[in-house]
Every structure is written in C-alpha cells, then in structure tokens.
Amino acid sequence: KVLYNGTDSIRRGEFTFTFAVPRDINYAPGTGLMNFSAINENHTLMAQGHEEGFGIDGSETVYNDSIGPSIYAYLNTPSFVDGGEVNCTPYFFAQITDKDGINASGNGIGHDMQLTIDGKLTQTYVLNDNFRYDFGSYTSGSTGYSLPELSEGHHTLQFRAWDILNNPSTVTLHFKVVKGLAPEIYS
C-alpha cells in the first residue's frame, strides 16, 4: 500500500523530505520500500533508485486537534458558485490542506477520499489515486475527477477527505446541469 507519493527538490545533489503516516496503518514490525526518481530542470537527465533496507515499527505520539482538513471545492472553474449551472459532465476539483497531513493512502475502513453524487452508492467514487500533494508538502494537495454524464436538473455532490489523525471533513456542492451548456475552461 502506498503511504506517500510526493515531490521535492534536489539541492547540491542531496534531497530530504518529510511526510506524515496515517494513524490507522498496520503498525506491525516490518520493512518498507521507497522508490525515487528525479529529473533535471531541462528534462535531459533522469535518475532512479530504491531503498528497501529500512524498518517500520511504531509511531510518534501526536496531539489530535480533532479538526478535519480544510477543503475548497468547485466544479469546472474556481468562479463556480454553489447552486450554479454546469454542463452534463462537469469536472470536480478540490484543494485540501491540514497542518497534520492529509490521508491519501486510503488505509483504514472508510478513510478514502470519496465523492458521492445525489447520495447514491452507485455514484460514489474513490479519488485517492487522483490526489497529488503540492510540491514539497505533505499538508496540502489537490484531487480532481471528471463526473460521468448527469441528467438535466438539480444535483448534489458530497466530497469527504481525512487527515492523518482520522479526522474527516465533508463539503457539499449543489448544482444544476443544463444540457448543451459549454463548460467554462480553466487551466
């Protein structure tokens, strides 16, 4: 299971990074595997490597603030307003931050980043694999998802994410699908 998939800089041939491990992983003694890859600024040199000779056992005691991550979510463009009109296949985007770290591993029952449309289990999607940490950070990142074609009319979307201390947050977006509406393009 992937615990962290992030990016950072190499400085003078060396690198360092920090990440937080979700509270609900299996803490049985064992070994882990780290895969590394690098590319220079000009995209002309690449390097790869791995390390599997390290142990995993136990964790540091951390104060739990009992507050879930902050989530800023929208459909198609940051100018989206809750209750606004969208095309039949809108793009969902969420920026997530938490000072303790974001759980993007999905370890633990029910701790996935999950998007649900109209409260239907058949329209529930796990977005863990779509999540990308911001460069050099384990406390912020984003995820996105192209929603399947939706019927015209009013819909509701709920998105839930967790921090590494098992505190969830949920955001709800209300929107109206208008057939033939061209999506607003945002890059």
Language model regions located:
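Long, low-complexity serine/threonine/glycine- and acidic-rich segments characteristic of extracellular
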Residues: 1-59, 72-83, 87-89, 93-180
